[in-house]
Amino acid sequence: MADKYDVIVVGAGPGGVTCGALLAKWGLKTLVVDKNSQVGGKAMTLSKSGFRYEYYPIWPCPGAESQIHAALKVLGIEDRVELIQPDPFGLMHYETPSGEIGSMIMRGPGHPLDPQDLFKLLGVGDADTEEVLRLFGEVALMAPHDQDLLDDVSTIEFLDRYDIPRSVYSFFATLQSEGTIEVPSDIACASEVVKIFQQLVTGGSGCYPAGGLGAMYEAIAGAAQANGSDILLETRVDRIAVQNGRVGGVFTEKGAFYAPIVVSNAGIQPTVLKLVGEEHFDKSYVNYVGDLVPSLGFAGARYILSKPVLEYPVYLYFSDNTVSTTDHIMKAKSGQMPEQIYVFISATSLCPGRAPPGKQLVHTGLSCPADTKVDPKTWLDKVEAEVARIWPDVVKHIEESEYYGSAHISAISRDSVVPGAGGECIGLGQIVGQCGKHKPSAKAPISGLFYVGADAGSTGFFANNLAVASGMNVAKMVLQYFKTHPR
Ligand SMILES: Cc1cc2nc3c(=O)[nH]c(=O)nc-3n(C[C@H](O)[C@H](O)[C@H](O)COP(=O)(O)OP(=O)(O)OC[C@H]3O[C@@H](n4cnc5c(N)ncnc54)[C@H](O)[C@@H]3O)c2cc1C
């Protein structure tokens, strides 16, 4: 293995591995370093006791023509990653104020959401239909310029422009804020919500790589290696070397590696405040980075069931009272959980062959602060009570349970360097002031240093898709920089 490269990518999460693979394909001598034993970051797939599953519950989205499809195509490996599309892929449950739980089937790509089915589930009466259709129509057809005008508007402020029933309000505010971008709806950026909703409407949901998301990132890593990239796993980068305002490489526990370009997938805050060190940046930039707000973390449970209980890959539950705001999160942190919560549950049935015959692995959980010091128990107790109420059969067949919280998420993704951050599900929160035109630049104010992944380099996508989009955009920026900055 060499010790000199054109570019070093710190982190092989969805953004890092995509970026590294593209740069290798375009001829740059590339090293990708990750502290984990496999690629994929928070989206890695594990194999254990005959199961093959993601660390975390996965909402497969969007269904077609996503950034992920585009990246596989550019890398020329679209034939090597089988994207399966279970249809139907899930059930959406809505609980009425009188306590009845209705359900609506969610179809795969090619079967966009039918407003009539949704109206039935949400009890939209004739008197409200016109206004609800106005909301759906405006969101689904909003032009890019108008979307950009929502960069400074929260989801709740946007919804308040419409005189809609509470059920429709909650559908948007719960599912498109906490349920999709993992941020409270009072700060969720409306331009992000609208863009992602449009992708869902046009592309549908439910597209998923056979073998798991991690298998797809392994295929991308394979493409990187086939193009000459080195991939160094189980190696933590301790420091990104900077001298005279330029990066020079990285220091790891396995030695130093040199390159005039370093792309960090380790999160913008850990990169600036720890790996490079604040002494290399202007005070104002350090303050700006320190004040960035993470997405929410997650308190999750994995259950091994003695028999397959859930028929579909994913299930959602919400009610009029599941809209989560910053105030709810703060109250929950002090022990006051809301009475009703949004619940997401997913099963290994997403992809055949992912569980031993006769068994099923089920994920569930609830958003909680990204703070690695928060004990997830309060959230887990609540979510387990809700699972028992809504899906009693699941609880009856639990053979084994595993639990995790934000500290665990941090351990396999980014370090916690700012109080309250580290265990974020997505990365930087897609909130007002941090999205669209306000998204941090992927080019750091140090020569040769870039950020990649959910934190920078793309906006207006959902999680894995966001990180992969960043991988593609940042790879282009790096290539341009490489060509214009001869060594
Ligand atoms: C509970 C949960 C549920 C989720 N559900 C979904 C979902 O349903 N659908 C969806 O699309 N997405 C989902 N996501 C989010 C998705 O996984 C992330 O948005 C995505 O993984 C972000 O990719 P990334 O490239 O930004 O970085 P990450 O995935 O965070 O990867 C960063 C990589 O950098 C490495 N790294 C960091 N620091 C160092 C260092 N110092 N040295 C070496 N390596 C380092 C890490 O080990 C890691 O591999 C979920 C996440 C969680 C936690």
Describe each region flagged by the PLM:
Residues 238-356:
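Mid-domain catalytic core of redox enzymes
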Residues 306-412:
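C-terminal segments that line or cap access tunnels to active or ligand-binding sites in enzymes
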Residues 94-190:
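Rossmann-like flavin
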Residues 196-247, 251:
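Helical element adjacent to the flavin cofactor pocket in flavoenzyme catalytic cores
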Residues 5-32:
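N-terminal Rossmann-like FAD-binding beta1-loop-alpha1 element of flavoenzymes
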Residues 24-48:
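Glycine-rich FAD pyrophosphate-binding loop
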Residues 51-131:
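Dinucleotide-binding Rossmann-like beta1-alpha1 core, especially the glycine-rich loop
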Residues 172-179, 393-459:
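A glycine-rich dinucleotide-binding beta-alpha-beta segment and adjacent secondary-structure elements
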